[in-house]
Structures are given as structure tokens and as C-alpha cells.
């Protein structure tokens, strides 16, 4: 793979790199400055010699433009020097994963979890309304704003694993559900359907969010320290719902049970 490491003050289009923010299997994210407007922004990069995830992410961000207060603004994309693809978007603040870890007891209050739940559900609904499923809902892909204007806004990030489930704006014309689908997502937060190789639907995004909210309130999930994927799946099937949801509000049990019964074609209410 081509090395696409960027240096401080390096130019990518009209954007100048300030520092690296994060790095993962698909590439890296940098804090940068728009030299035209002097605004802070984020640049995601990937090597040109790998299957592009930024192409999907750029497309989703463009589709969400003006349709969701929970999506970063798309600022540009392109290819540089034949070595890297890049995507530029607004810069957000700390991830919910970082905020959760920074708590002394690793717990958010009931009120905080409720506020986060509302915004996360809104963010997923906005995504679903344009015909896409996220497929990797987790605390690291959710963040708050970084300015006084948006520091209470939750943003949903990283659409590299997103998949179109409908080409119809009304979401009535669904793509056929596949069988034996490869695992997509993060083991800790994936729904049982994902472990079983089923096509992910809108309800699977929300089931992942349920696991996230439980972790926020309880500090951890029962399988947090389990490394074996099959054992995690077994624990998810075996644990009583009442035990899993004992630290969150009672209404979560009803919602979890309803989501667990849904199929790919079903629209969560």
C-alpha cells in the first residue's frame, strides 16, 4: 500500500494540514485550515490503491447536505498526486467515546443518555430517509460540535460502511435482502442479525444504538472484555433483556423487543 502520511503544513488542495487527529484501517483524519476562508476543517485520506470508502462517504454527505443538522458539511473531495483520495468536511469536537471514557465512573446520567438518544435517533432517521443504513453505529462514530453554536449537537460520522437499502425517496422500493452477508460493523455493538450474516436493515442501526446507550449508562456491556466474536454473539442471544437493560429507563425494554422482532423490510417507528 502507498504511504499516504501527511506532514504539518502540507497542502491538500486549498487546505493546509495542522495535525493528525486519528488513524484507522482505512486511512487517517487530519485537522486542517481552509486557506481561502481560514476555517478549521477535517480531511480524511486513503491510499488510491485500496477499495475506496471515501467515495461512499462523500456521496452520503452530499445527499445529507441541507437535510440533517447531525451531518458534517461536505466541503470538497478529490485525488492528490495520484497517491491519495481525500474528503474535506467540517471539523467536529470530541467523540462520545472520548467523553464517556473521560467520566470518572464511565457513566452518563439518565438525563444525558436521554438527550443523546433523541439526537442519535434523529441522525439515523435522517440517514435512513435518504435511503442509507450506517452499519457501524458506535460511540466513536458519534461526536459533539466544537463551537458554542453546536457544542450540544450530536453529529454522526464515518459513512464508509454505509449501504443503500432503497433507491426510492419514499423508501418503498427496497433492494432485495441478501443471504450470507459478510460481517460489517463493530463486534461490540453489532446486532445479532449481523452475527448471523443477515442483511442489515434500519432496525439494526437502532439495535446498535441501544447497545451504545446501555454502555453509556451502565459504563460497560457484559461482553466488553470478550475477544471471541462467536462468544460475543452467544452472550447477546443468551442474556435476558431485563438484565441487559437494567440500568436504563424501563421504556427501553419495549423498544428493544420491538426492534428485535423486525425484519429488513420493516421501518422503525
Stretch-by-stretch model annotation:
Residues 82-95:
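Conserved short submotifs of the Hanks-type protein kinase catalytic core
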Residues 73-85:
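Short beta-strand micro-motifs within the conserved protein kinase catalytic domain, predominantly
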Residues 116-117:
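Activation segment signature within eukaryotic-like protein kinase domains
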Residues 143-184:
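Activation segment/activation loop of eukaryotic-type protein kinase catalytic domains
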Amino acid at each position: 500500500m502507498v504511504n499516504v502520511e501527511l506532514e504539518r503544513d502540507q497542502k491538500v488542495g486549498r487546505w493546509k494540514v495542522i495535525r493528525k487527529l486519528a488513524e484507522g484501517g482505512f486511512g487517517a483524519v487530519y485537522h486542517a485550515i481552509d486557506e481561502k476562508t481560514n476555517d478549521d476543517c477535517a480531511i480524511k485520506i486513503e491510499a488510491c490503491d485500496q477499495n475506496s470508502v471515501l467515495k461512499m462517504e462523500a456521496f452520503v454527505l452530499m445527499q445529507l447536505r441541507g437535510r440533517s443538522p447531525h451531518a458534517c458539511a461536505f466541503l470538497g473531495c478529490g485525488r492528490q498526486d495520484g497517491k491519495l483520495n481525500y474528503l474535506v468536511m467540517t471539523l467536529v469536537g470530541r467523540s462520545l467515546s472520548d467523553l464517556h471514557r473521560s467520566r470518572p465512573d464511565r457513566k452518563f446520567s439518565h438525563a444525558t443518555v436521554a438527550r443523546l438518544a433523541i439526537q442519535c435517533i434523529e441522525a439515523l432517521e435522517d440517514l435512513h430517509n435518504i435511503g442509507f443504513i450506517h452499519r457501524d453505529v458506535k460511540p466513536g462514530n458519534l461526536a459533539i460540535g466544537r463551537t458554542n453554536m453546536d457544542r450540544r449537537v450530536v453529529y454522526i460520522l464515518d459513512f464508509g460502511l454505509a449501504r443503500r437499502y432503497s433507491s426510492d425517496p419514499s423508501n418503498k422500493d427496497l433492494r432485495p435482502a441478501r443471504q450470507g452477508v459478510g460481517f460489517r460493523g463493530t463486534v461490540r455493538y453489532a446486532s445479532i442479525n449481523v452475527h448471523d450474516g443477515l442483511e442489515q436493515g434500519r432496525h439494526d442501526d437502532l439495535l446498535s444504538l441501544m447497545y451504545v446507550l446501555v454502555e453509556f449508562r451502565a459504563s460497560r456491556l457484559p461482553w466488553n472484555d470478550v475477544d471471541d466474536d462467536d462468544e460475543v454473539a452467544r452472550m447477546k442471544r443468551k442474556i435476558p433483556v431485563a438484565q441487559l437493560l437494567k440500568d436504563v429507563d424501563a421504556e427501553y425494554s419495549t423498544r428493544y423487543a420491538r426492534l428485535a422482532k423486525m425484519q429488513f423490510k420493516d421501518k422503525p417507528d
